[in-house]
């Protein structure tokens, strides 16, 4: 089943809150998590549902005329490694291409710092993202920011 676009802003917020509240390993800073949730009302978002319930979502944010950022993504831990995350990335990339974007970027904690984020890094690499740049202190000294980029030109 493919991921689907969520047009209703209130539904996007509800989905973001439901998923992110269950992922404290990745979204453990309450103020930052709340910002992701409120931003979902204004951003293009996609959901993956299983048996009628959301198990994953992804929101995009424009960062330049040619580039869109995968601003936030979450998939319930019990649903990892089942293809739902890839379906979300594929749907978002197709949408971004249709909207005329050439690149998609994503930020995460650099590989080698935390096992949870190492899995996240490997996921993005498996989706075709390429390492672009690391900002060692963008977030703080303990969480170097790795930027990956995906070419949307096929």
Show the residue positions of the predicted features.
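Conserved acetyl-CoA binding element of GNAT-fold acetyltransferases
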Residues: 66-77, 86, 105-107
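Short hydrophobic/aromatic beta-strand or adjacent loop that forms the aromatic wall/cage
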Residues: 43, 143-148
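Conserved GNAT acetyl-CoA-binding A-motif
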Residues: 96-116
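Conserved beta-strand in the GNAT
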Residues: 47, 53-61, 67-74
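Conserved active-site tyrosine of GNAT-family acetyltransferases
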Residues: 124, 129
């Amino acid at each position: 089943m493919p991921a689907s676009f969520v047009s209703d802003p209130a539904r996007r917020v509800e989905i973001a809150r439901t998923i992110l509240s269950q992922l404290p390993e990745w979204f453990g800073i309450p103020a930052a998590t709340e910002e992701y949730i409120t931003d979902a009302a204004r951003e293009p978002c996609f959901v993956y549902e299983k048996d009628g319930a959301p198990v994953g979502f992804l929101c995009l944010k424009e960062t330049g005329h040619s580039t869109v950022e995968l601003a936030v993504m979450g998939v319930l831990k019990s649903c990892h490694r089942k293809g739902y995350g890839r379906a979300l990335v594929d749907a978002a990339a197709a949408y971004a291409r249709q909207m005329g974007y050439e690149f998609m970027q994503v930020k995460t904690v650099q590989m080698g710092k935390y096992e949870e984020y190492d899995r996240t890094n490997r996921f993005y690499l498996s989706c075709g993202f390429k390492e672009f740049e690391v900002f060692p202190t963008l977030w703080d000294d303990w969480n170097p920011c790795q930027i990956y980029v995906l070419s949307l030109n096929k």
